[in-house]
C-alpha cells in the first residue's frame, strides 16, 4: 500500500515512562583524539559485529507532540533489521522490517505498508522525523557519515554534530554498557532545534 501524506500512527503520550540512566560508565575527563589507534580499534570491533539486538525506552519530544514508547531493535545481517515500538501499555504500535531495497511496516491496526526508504516511511506514518538511516550507526556508537564528533576518555563517542537535508542533529552519549564487549551505548539524546529524541538501552546482545 502506498504511503499516505499524513500522520497515521499516534502512540499513547503517557508520561509514565522515565528515561533514567542505569549503572553504566559515563564520559569523564578530557576527550581523546579521533586519530588515536584505540578509537580506530573500537570502531573496527563494533563494525565486526554481524548480529545484535537491544531493547529499551524511547521518547520523542517536540512542540507538536510527545511520544513515549518501548523499543526493540534487532539486526540480523547487513542492512537487514527489525524495529518494534510498543506503547507503555505493552501493545504493538509499529513493526518495521527492512532489507536491501524493501521496507515493510505494519501499524497498530494491522495495516501493511511498503517502501524502499525506512526513514521516509517512519516520518510520513508517525509524524516523527527520526534520522533512522544515521541512527543505525549512532546507536552503535559509530559516527556514520558525520565528521564532526568528540570522544570521551575511553576512546568512545561522546558527541556528534551532523547536518543533512536541513536538519542539524546533535547527539550526546550519556554512558556506555561495559558488560558488553565492545562497550555499547547505554543512553543517548538527539536534538534538532525544538525536537528531542531520547534512547535508553536496557541491554545489548551482540554476536
UniProtKB/Swiss-Prot annotation:
InterPro entries: LolA/LolB/LppX (IPR029046), OM_lipoprot_LolB (IPR004565). It is a lipid-anchor. It is found in: Cell outer membrane. GO terms for biological process: lipoprotein localization to outer membrane; lipoprotein metabolic process; protein transport. Keywords: Cell outer membrane, Chaperone, Lipoprotein, Membrane, Palmitate, Protein transport, Signal, Transport. Gene3D superfamilies: Lipoprotein localisation LolA/LolB/LppX (2.50.20.10). GO terms for cellular component: cell outer membrane; outer membrane-bounded periplasmic space. It comes from the Bacteria. Residues 1-21 form the signal peptide. A lipid is attached at residue 22 (N-palmitoyl cysteine). Disulfide bonds: none annotated. Plays a critical role in the incorporation of lipoproteins in the outer membrane after they are released by the LolA protein. Essential for E.coli viability. Monomer. Belongs to the LolB family. This is Outer-membrane lipoprotein LolB. It comes from Escherichia coli (strain K12). The lineage of its organism: Bacteria, Pseudomonadati, Pseudomonadota, Gammaproteobacteria, Enterobacterales.
Amino acid at each position: 500500500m502506498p504511503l499516505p501524506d499524513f500522520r497515521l500512527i499516534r502512540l499513547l503520550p503517557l508520561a509514565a515512562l522515565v528515561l533514567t540512566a542505569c549503572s553504566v560508565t559515563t564520559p569523564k575527563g578530557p576527550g581523546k583524539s579521533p586519530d588515536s589507534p584505540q578509537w580506530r580499534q573500537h570502531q573496527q570491533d563494533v563494525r565486526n559485529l554481524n548480529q545484535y539486538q537491544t531493547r529499551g525506552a524511547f521518547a520523542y519530544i517536540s512542540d507538536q507532540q510527545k511520544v513515549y514508547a518501548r523499543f526493540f531493535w534487532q539486526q540480523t545481517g547487513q542492512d537487514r533489521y527489525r524495529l518494534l515500538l510498543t506503547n507503555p501499555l505493552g501493545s504493538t504500535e509499529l513493526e518495521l522490517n527492512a532489507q536491501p531495497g524493501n521496507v515493510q511496516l505494519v501499524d497498530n491496526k494491522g495495516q501493511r505498508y511498503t517502501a524502499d526508504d525506512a526513514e521516509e516511511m517512519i516520518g510520513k506514518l508517525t509524524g516523527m522525523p527520526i534520522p533512522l538511516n544515521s541512527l543505525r550507526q549512532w546507536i552503535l556508537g559509530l559516527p556514520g557519515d558525520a565528521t564532526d564528533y568528540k570522544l570521551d576518555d575511553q576512546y568512545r563517542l561522546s558527541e556528534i554534530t551532523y547536518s543533512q537535508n536541513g536538519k542539524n542533529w546533535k547527539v550526546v552519549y550519556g554512558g556506555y554498557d561495559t558488560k558488553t564487549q565492545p562497550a555499547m551505548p547505554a543512553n543517548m539524546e538527539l536534538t534538532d532545534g525544538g525536537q528531542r529524541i531520547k534512547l535508553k538501552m536496557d541491554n545489548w546482545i551482540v554476536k
